[in-house]
């Protein structure tokens, strides 16, 4: 007898057929989405390549155009060498490629040109980049007169004058930079560093504290404050700042030397020598530390140790008056009278040579006189 098919089995069979992944609508949608995404990516790739190619072509066309324009301007200036408009255009085109030639072109631009001060600024930038400090200074002097409110010109000029040793003149422009709106820590630090070289140590504290207010962890400001406090009679501040510097840079021979000086001044010679030995283990050729240690040894009547410490440096330091004077004292203390006399004579010659050099005040006075004659 034939059995009828169970209705539940029929239902289950059809249910299994509907769940077939190859025939589900979700799978079809997913497959279609993948195809669309693939086509999109292919089109994007082609579009990106197209844009890249267009950009490369555009850049090449620009370079070709600039090259053609340079040739035209050069040919034109051979016929009309006094055309300052052409000189300005050529200077702009070649400033990055041929800075010295651009400097020459910009130098032909006079005050009659509507963009004269742009040419002067370009001269200052090129001259600074190429180490032509004299040209840069002349250009910056023009710019600070024309744009006294532009602090960055004042700062650049201050740095140049500082490097030349014209400290009082440099200080004037460094302060004008701050008055013009220069309120960054480095602006105050520059003022402090100029004051230091000018020998105006007590005045350093104000700008250094302002720098540290703006940047509490500025290492150079802490180190300069240690120096200012040391030579202004504030050993507590000097000690605190020197130790802070050592915590940031344990190999700072300068901070170690400051601590050595503080301990020497307080009569703790052993501690002072300990700091100096630590510094010299880091840098055996540190002249400042060597001179300080030799001075302490001479004070202790240990002339032979001081002489042995300094003598090996003679070949490289014989033009340094402080070194020659220290070696002369050590030689005299050890009974080397002839050598001590020769060193004293050398020291006198070095003093005369220094006296013949114009000081920063003298050089500023001369430059003012020359400027007044122009």
Segment roles from a protein language model:
Residues 62-72, 96-108, 129-142, 164-176, ...:
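Structural signature of tandem alpha-helical TPR/SEL1-like repeats
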Residues 1-15:
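N-terminal intrinsically disordered, acidic low-complexity segments at the extreme N-terminus
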Residues 315-355:
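TPR/TPR-like (Sel1-like) alpha-helical repeat modules
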Residues 24-107, 111, 354-360:
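N-terminal leader/linker segments that initiate helical-solenoid repeat arrays
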Residues 84-85, 117-118, 151-152, 184-186, ...:
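Helix-start (N-cap) detector for alpha-helical repeat units in TPR-like alpha-solenoids
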Residues 79, 112-113, 146-147, 179-181, ...:
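Structural marker of alpha-solenoid helical repeat scaffolds
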